[in-house]
Amino acid sequence: MGTIFHLDIVSAEESIYSGPAEFIVAPAVMGEVGIFPQHTPMLTRIKSGVVRVKAPLQDDEEVYVSGGMLEVQPDVVTILADTAVRGKDLDEAKALEAKRKAEEIMKNKISEIEYARAQAELIEATAQLAAIQKLRKRGH
């Protein structure tokens, strides 16, 4: 039984992490899941939240994801995220401004399409702010 597996975290924009991991914790829709080497194969949806990565001989890394898919094979784990941002790169001021703008658009009740877009942006900004608070509590 191996002590590490290969992890890829990718979004439509870029590859955020590609390398060895000892374990990860990911925000699956069914609740947080912990993945160790030789885990039973699994395919599940993930929700907005923080993926925690324990890599050998490195500091733990946190990556914010806004949803997507998690595929687990015994020696390879892949996270295909809608959006992925390293925890240290999350911008609280930007998220607060996006939240404020989305709320303002929703108040003005423009078209249904603009309302739906603003609602999605509000959900994204709120999830990023929650991730920032969670990381702050952990001392990052």
Swiss-Prot record:
One Pfam family assigned to this protein is ATP-synt_DE
Q: What is its main location?
A: membrane
Q: Which UniProt keywords apply?
A: ATP synthesis, Cell inner membrane, Cell membrane, CF(1), Hydrogen ion transport, Ion transport, Membrane, Transport
Topology in the lipid bilayer is annotated as: Peripheral membrane protein
Query: Molecular function (GO) terms listed?
Result: ATP binding; proton-transporting ATP synthase activity, rotational mechanism
InterPro entries on file: ATP_F1_dsu/esu_C_sf (IPR036794), ATP_synth_F1_dsu/esu (IPR001469), ATP_synth_F1_dsu/esu_N (IPR020546), ATP_synth_F1_esu_C (IPR020547), ATPsynth_dsu/esu_N (IPR036771)
One GO term describing the cellular component: proton-transporting ATP synthase complex
The subcellular localization recorded is: Cell inner membrane
Quaternary organization: F-type ATPases have 2 components, CF(1) - the catalytic core - and CF(0) - the membrane proton channel. CF(1) has five subunits: alpha(3), beta(3), gamma(1), delta(1), epsilon(1). CF(0) has three main subunits: a, b and c.
| Biological function | Produces ATP from ADP in the presence of a proton gradient across the membrane.
Concerning its family, UniProt says: Belongs to the ATPase epsilon chain family.
Question: What is the recorded name of this protein?
Answer: ATP synthase epsilon chain
